[in-house]
């Protein structure tokens, strides 16, 4: 296919048009008085959102050169979303400001490579300063404030703070759609996995159809149990202790299952069998997790262990186990806290190394089950359109809160970026490197300018006053007052602000140093006509 090539000024101008179209659509959502954007969906009702990355991903431009510019900025939003989970609109605003200022200077004769060095130098200093002014997040109130600012809803803030308090910072918090109107929180404490009892005759509460075992022994194996003789020795030891038993195995079937059910119904002993969670290597890892949590051993041939020689000492224990037809919950496993901590650190290290998003998600789930529990935020709304919009906002708020716990918080509303202005301005440089630093300085003002603009005010006036205010004092666009941002609960996670600045500068520097752009040439003749299949003379067929 023939290619269309544009060089230097033409290339950069075409890409800038794309950057502007995407950024202008995204930046109207910034701040407490930001507006929504409606996205057409081929099926179903349109999506109404103020989430920057969702809008950016939907934009596809007709001109291939403009589209390349738009896609570059869309990547800024996506990358910021991947790393920090929020701040995508801020990242887009920063990228647009840097690209616009940079192109003005490059067009006027500045060397793009020198400008790039200046941008990198300024951003490195800005990030150091952000870390220096960052405050750790400690109280439940602070967590609620971060979530409320991100979602624009105080109730959501309280809900997420409650969830994080209940399951801990490492706990899994999932967001699901509710069937009702209310948004509520459901917390599962302890380790839960999605496998239920192998026979309904094992239940202890026939009304709720669940089996509740108090202080049970837990046999963990990756083998299939067909013959009761295999587990008879350990079963007899448990019966002598007069305690219930949970068996986690690949499967329990045939004669073994029948014998267990029969003895359960006769009241000889209380035992429940469940299938092991997961598949393949992941199953082995999850069984090992359960063993560490309950202080037991996995009876597996990999370790040279056999079921018929297993003893009570190799079994795990827990305060309580609840088994339903769909899942099993182990509450307060009796494992050694040092071993559990070591396992948690091992899983964390695996999360850092893995490149697969799916694997990372599964590792995060395992981490949560060991470290805390699982909280489910059930999102309710009156209509499907409102439900989708609300769910997106709550996801952003959750990501924002996690980022705040990780790296702390800075003053919100773009205030932190302006407060580091003087430190960046103090950098010594000359020529094109100085030009690069000035480009970053101009972009640091842009989020405040845009927040003020969206609130119907003159951004430049707000920025100038902000530069002369005391550190931490900023403009609250929600009510038009000048307040101490952190005291007023208007905060941004440091990680979100840092990621936005890093990703914006990275793409801006790349675009400024672009000298040629290659795109497919559109086919001027349009698609070829369908050829005549020579069946014109067959009209007499019935």
Swiss-Prot record:
Keywords: ATP-binding, Chaperone, Cytoplasm, Isomerase, Nucleotide-binding. It is an enzyme of class 5 (isomerase). GO terms for molecular function: ATP binding; ATP-dependent protein folding chaperone; isomerase activity; unfolded protein binding. It is found in: Cytoplasm. One of its GO terms (biological process) is response to heat. PROSITE patterns: CHAPERONINS_CPN60. Residues 522-542 are annotated as: Disordered. The keyword Metal-binding does not apply. GO terms for cellular component: GroEL-GroES complex. Its main location: cytoplasm. CDD domains: GroEL. InterPro entries: Chaperonin_Cpn60_CS, Cpn60/GroEL, Cpn60/GroEL/TCP-1, GroEL-like_apical_dom_sf, GROEL-like_equatorial_sf, TCP-1-like_intermed_sf. ATP binds at residues 29-32, 86-90, 413, 476-478, 492. It catalyses: ATP + H2O + a folded polypeptide = ADP + phosphate + an unfolded polypeptide. Its EC number is 5.6.1.7. NCBIfam families: GroEL, PRK00013.1, PRK12849.1, PRK12850.1, PRK12851.1. Belongs to the chaperonin (HSP60) family. Forms a cylinder of 14 subunits composed of two heptameric rings stacked back-to-back. Interacts with the co-chaperonin GroES. Together with its co-chaperonin GroES, plays an essential role in assisting protein folding. The GroEL-GroES system forms a nano-cage that allows encapsulation of the non-native substrate proteins and provides a physical environment optimized to promote and accelerate protein folding. This is Chaperonin GroEL. It comes from Listeria monocytogenes serovar 1/2a (strain ATCC BAA-679 / EGD-e).
């Amino acid at each position: 296919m023939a290619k269309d090539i544009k060089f230097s000024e033409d290339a950069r101008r075409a890409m800038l048009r794309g950057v502007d179209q995407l950024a202008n659509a995204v930046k109207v959502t910034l701040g407490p008085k930001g507006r929504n954007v409606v996205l057409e969906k081929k099926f179903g009702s349109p999506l109404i959102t103020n989430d920057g990355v969702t809008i950016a991903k939907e934009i596809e431009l007709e001109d291939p050169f403009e589209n390349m510019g738009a896609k570059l900025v869309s990547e800024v939003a996506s990358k910021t979303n991947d790393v920090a989970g929020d701040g995508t609109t801020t990242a887009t605003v920063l990228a647009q400001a840097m690209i616009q200022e940079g192109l003005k200077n490059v067009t006027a004769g500045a060397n793009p490579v020198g400008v790039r060095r200046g941008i990198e130098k300024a951003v490195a200093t800005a990030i150091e300063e952000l870390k220096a002014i960052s405050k750790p997040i400690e109280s439940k109130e602070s967590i609620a404030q971060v979530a409320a600012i991100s979602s624009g809803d105080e109730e959501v803030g309280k809900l997420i703070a409650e969830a994080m308090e209940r399951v801990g910072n490492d706990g899994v918090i999932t967001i699901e759609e509710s069937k009702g109107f209310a948004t509520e929180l459901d917390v599962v404490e302890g380790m839960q996995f999605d496998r239920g009892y192998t026979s309904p005759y094992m239940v202890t509460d026939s009304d709720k159809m669940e089996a509740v075992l108090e202080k049970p022994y837990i046999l963990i194996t990756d083998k299939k149990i067909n013959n009761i003789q295999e587990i008879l020795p350990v079963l007899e030891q448990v019966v002598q202790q007069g305690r219930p038993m949970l068996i986690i195995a690949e499967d329990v079937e045939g004669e073994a299952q029948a014998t267990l059910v029969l003895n359960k119904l006769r009241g000889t002993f209380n035992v429940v069998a469940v299938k092991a969670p997961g598949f393949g290597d992941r199953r082995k890892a999850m069984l090992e997790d359960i063993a560490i949590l309950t202080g037991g051993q996995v009876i597996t041939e990999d370790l040279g262990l056999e079921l018929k020689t297993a003893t009570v000492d190799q079994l795990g224990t827990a305060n309580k186990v609840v088994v339903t037809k769909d899942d099993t919950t182990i509450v307060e496993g009796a494992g050694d806290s040092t071993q559990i901590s070591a396992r948690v650190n091992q899983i964390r290290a695996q999360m850092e190394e893995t490149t697969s998003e799916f694997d990372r998600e599964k590792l995060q789930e395992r981490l949560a089950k060991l470290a805390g529990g699982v909280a489910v935020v059930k999102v309710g709304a009156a209509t499907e359109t409102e439900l989708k919009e609300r769910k997106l906002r709550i996801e952003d708020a959750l990501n924002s809160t996690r980022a705040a716990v990780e790296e702390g918080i800075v003053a919100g509303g773009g205030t932190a970026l302006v407060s580091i202005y003087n430190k960046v301005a103090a950098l010594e440089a000359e020529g094109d490197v100085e030009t690069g630093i000035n480009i970053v300085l101009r972009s640091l003002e842009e989020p405040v300018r845009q927040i003020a603009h969206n609130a119907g005010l003159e951004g430049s006036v707000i920025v100038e006053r902000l530069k002369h205010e005391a550190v931490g004092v900023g403009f609250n666009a929600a009510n038009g007052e000048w307040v101490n941002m952190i005291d007023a609960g208007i905060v941004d996670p440091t990680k979100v602000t840092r990621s936005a600045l890093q990703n914006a500068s990275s793409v801006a520097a790349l675009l400024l140093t672009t000298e040629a752009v290659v795109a497919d040439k559109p086919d001027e003749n349009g698609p070829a006509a369908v050829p005549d299949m020579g069946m014109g003379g067959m009209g007499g067929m019935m």
